[in-house]
A protein has these predicted regions:
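Phosphate-handling active-site elements
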Residues: 95, 139-152, 177-196, 221-225, ...
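Conserved acidic residues
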Residues: 99, 228-230, 468
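Short, glycine/charged-enriched secondary-structure capping and boundary segments
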Residues: 117-121, 175, 211-214, 245-249, ...
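Acidic/histidine-rich catalytic neighborhood of metal-dependent amide-processing enzymes
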Residues: 152-250
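Extended hydrophobic secondary-structure segments that form protein cores and membrane-embedded regions
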Residues: 103-104, 196-200, 231-232, 424, ...
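Acidic/His- and Gly-rich active-site-bordering loop/insert found
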Residues: 2-162, 183-193
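Short beta-strand segments
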Residues: 105-107, 199, 232-235, 262, ...
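Metal-dependent amide/peptide-bond hydrolase catalytic core
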Residues: 2-7, 11-14, 53-54, 237-241, ...
């Protein structure tokens, strides 16, 4: 272990209490707004997509206060609403346009908190305030609900709350990491690199929204010193079976397929007078599920796994519950593996026998890809089709190799878990892939699109698209996310911050 390795590990341990404090507050903040009247500044959706401002305003102020940036103006909000902070060593003698540019990406929004359900099911845990009565905590529920929990004797390390596992811990780790890099600037922690940390918004509703904004409005005219060589995605990369803090190098893509079945409404006592879109639509859902169960029309990939399709959302337009409905709209969540395309995925739904049967019976069936039209908290509307591209960074890419090296230098000497023994911190680095989706889907662009300096930055070409090399490394167990009782083992914050603080200098060649 070099002196820089030892110093990074030492400071990451020193600042663990600070990281835990920041994470708890970032989780808690919506509690100040969700029950407050709107005319008094309240927001019942605070903390969810497009309602992140109170949380990221706290984070910006805290990042400045703890000296995770050199000066106040180095932490700011971009036009989309992402929180950005930047660190660089201006005295390292290397021109900015020759430095490696590292992005650390983590989203700040969460899924709906479901506060009442938390209290009802966990007994003594609030989705914002964490444990409020330890004597009432329903341990049996937590053990059944969550993918992994440490032994009960170690539960004092757990931080509970919506956003703990997915994925505020990654954002906090980035803040601690840039603080460490600045403190160890003289020892080479920032030599030859520029680090941009992005605390993005709207990821849960519209995966990759923050990076999509960058691709549209920033990268096409940006200086090379702004365009990333590598993106570290800090979404949850722990596995309940194989270990915490995996190094992930890919994920499947996903899309939404919307099906609208229009029928003819009538009184429920005379159903023969109408055409029931719910019944015909239900047949479409059933056939689609059967085809998926038989893997008809789905490809498989050795690394990313097979494509999937499941009904995920529905809306019924009906005059009453004693009538034949007028319209039934539902969506399929379609996960796309290598070799699958949005066009073919829509065509597969179009080709279902139940679609033809509905049309023959006189109903209208429309199949489309919906557009995301909601505005960010800053008022920016992307209007993007809800197609989110998968990506893979080759295992031999220098970014993956640097990630493995960073893990071995600052994490391996300080943990002793074994891969395959639950969601523990493992001594050996584990290179794998995500099951779910991340902000990474927002970075791929058409192969022929022009981005300054992309060629010399070793961007990855995947078919007709290209993207910066991406790796995943984040706190939280993937199988604990989006669940009642979501939690994080705070010890992951320490090692995640150490990794993020060490990776940039290794990638720049300062091993």
């Amino acid at each position: 272990m070099s002196n820089l390795d030892a110093r990074i590990a030492e400071l990451a341990a020193k600042y663990l209490p600070l990281a835990s404090e920041m994470l708890k507050e970032a989780i808690r903040i919506p509690a100040d707004y969700v029950d407050k009247p709107i005319d008094q500044g309240g927001d019942p959706a605070c903390g969810t997509s497009n309602h992140e401002f109170p949380r990221i305003d706290y984070l910006r102020k805290k990042i400045v206060a703890i000296k995770a940036v050199r000066k106040d103006e180095d932490a700011y909000f971009d036009a989309f609403g992402n929180l950005v902070w930047r660190v660089e060593d201006p005295t390292d003698g290397i021109p900015s346009d020759q430095k490696k540019v590292i992005y650390i990406d983590g989203h700040t929004d969460t899924v709906k908190p479901l506060r009442a359900q938390w209290l009802q099911n966990t007994g003594g845990i609030d989705c914002f305030d964490g444990i409020i009565d330890a004597t009432k905590v329903n341990k049996d529920f937590l053990n059944k609900e969550l993918g992994y929990l440490p032994p009960e004797s170690e539960w004092n390390h757990l931080i509970f709350g919506r956003g703990s596992a997915d994925q505020l811990g990654g954002v906090i780790s980035a803040a601690i990491a840039t603080k460490i890099m600045l403190e160890l600037e003289a020892e080479g922690a920032l030599k030859g690199v520029i680090v941009y940390s992005y605390a993005t918004v709207c990821e849960e509703d519209n995966d990759g929204a923050g990076p999509m904004y960058l691709n549209r409005d920033v990268f096409p005219t940006a200086a090379p010193a702004v365009v990333p060589d590598v993106v570290i995605l800090t979404d949850s990369s722990g596995c309940s079976k194989n270990g915490a803090l995996g190094i992930y190098r890919g994920q499947r893509g996903r899309m939404q397929i919307e099906v609208t079945v229009k029928g003819k409404s009538c009184h429920g006592s005379m159903p023969w007078e109408g055409k029931n879109p719910l019944e015909f639509g239900g047949a479409i859902v059933k056939e689609a599920a059967d085809k998926y169960d038989q893997r008809i029309g789905f490809k498989d990939d050795k690394f990313l796994g097979h494509g999937t399709r499941t009904a995920s959302w529905a809306r019924l337009d009906t005059p009453s519950d004693c009538a034949v409905p007028e319209k039934f709209t539902f969506r399929f969540d379609r996960r796309l593996t290598i070799g699958e395309t949005p066009e073919q995925s829509c065509a597969d739904v179009e080709a279902l026998d139940a679609v033809a049967v509905a049309r023959k019976a006189g109903l209208t069936v429309e199949i489309s890809i919906p557009t995301y039209t909601d505005a960010s908290w800053k008022g920016y509307v992307l209007n993007n089709p809800q197609v989110y591209l998968g990506w893979v960074t080759p295992e031999e890419h220098p970014a993956v190799q640097a990630a493995v090296a960073a893990y071995k230098k600052v994490i391996s000497p300080n943990v002793d878990g074994k891969v395959g023994t639950g969601g523990v911190l493992t001594k050996e680095p584990r290179v794998d892939r995500w099951v779910f989706s991340t902000d990474g889907v927002g970075y791929p662009i058409p192969k022929d699109a022009s981005v300054p300096g992309a060629a010399r930055k070793q961007w990855v070409n995947n078919g007709v698209y290209k993207h910066p090399a991406m790796i995943g490394f984040g706190t939280g167990i993937e199988q604990n996310t989006h669940k009642i009782g979501e939690c994080l083992d705070e010890r992951e914050l320490q090692h995640s911050a150490a990794f993020l603080a060490r990776f940039p200098s290794i990638y720049a060649g300062n091993a």
